[in-house]
A protein has these predicted regions:
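A short beta-loop-alpha structural element at the N-terminal edge
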Residues: 11-26
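Conserved beta-strand in the GNAT
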Residues: 65, 72-83
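Conserved acetyl-CoA-binding loop-helix of GNAT-fold acetyltransferases
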Residues: 112-126, 144-148
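Conserved GNAT acetyl-CoA-binding A-motif
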Residues: 126-138
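Conserved active-site alpha-helix within GNAT-family acetyltransferase domains
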Residues: 138-155, 160
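C-terminal "cap" of GNAT-fold acetyltransferases
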Residues: 159-171
Length: 171
């Protein structure tokens, strides 16, 4: 059964299905264009996230879509339950606690509907009291959303390719 967001009652979160891939790919393409228009030219390059990665996430049951009341997909994200390997080493800061957490990755919207972040966060909080996320230093919109929704900037992490991200935690 889809999870209805309390913050955005007209949005629902459900597990992504392989048939959702075309809509998800279009959402990520729109998000990349929006990032570029806002000066964020270094994040999500070379077609990231790829359809292959999205299918891997779908099969692992960690990919979700935000839908409108009529079932239209308006956003997508990955929710990792358990330890995020790149969060094992945090630089220039510390995590507020060592409690179990979920991690929001690859949150994207096509821009048609507001409240995607709130729907995603509501869903994540239904899985864990502690939520972590990270973003690129040039992704000012995501940084703003995180802070506005109570996330604390905790430090810097490095991805497998050694690119730097700002790490946040709520709870």
């Amino acid at each position: 059964m889809p999870h209805a967001s309390q913050a955005a009652p007209r949005l629902f979160v459900r597990p992504a299905l392989p048939d959702d891939l075309p809509a998800m790919s279009a959402i990520y393409a729109a998000a990349r264009r929006l990032m570029r228009s806002r000066g964020n030219v270094h994040q999500w390059v070379n077609g990231y996230p790829s359809d292959e990665l999205l299918l891997t996430d779908i099969r692992a049951q960690r990919s979700f879509v935000c839908t409108t009341e009529d079932g239209q997909i308006a956003g997508a994200f990955c929710l990792l339950c358990g330890i995020e390997p790149t969060y094992q080493r945090l630089y220039d800061g510390e995590w507020p606690n060592d409690l179990p957490y979920v991690t929001i990755h690859r949150l994207a919207s096509d821009g048609r509907v507001g409240g995607i972040f709130r729907a995603c966060l509501s869903f994540a909080r239904s899985k864990s009291a502690v939520v972590r996320a990270d973003t690129h230093k040039d992704n000012l919109k995501m940084q703003q959303l995180l802070v506005q929704n109570g996330f604390q900037r905790c430090g810097i992490i490095y991805l497998e390719d050694q690119s730097q991200r700002i790490a946040y935690q709520l709870g």
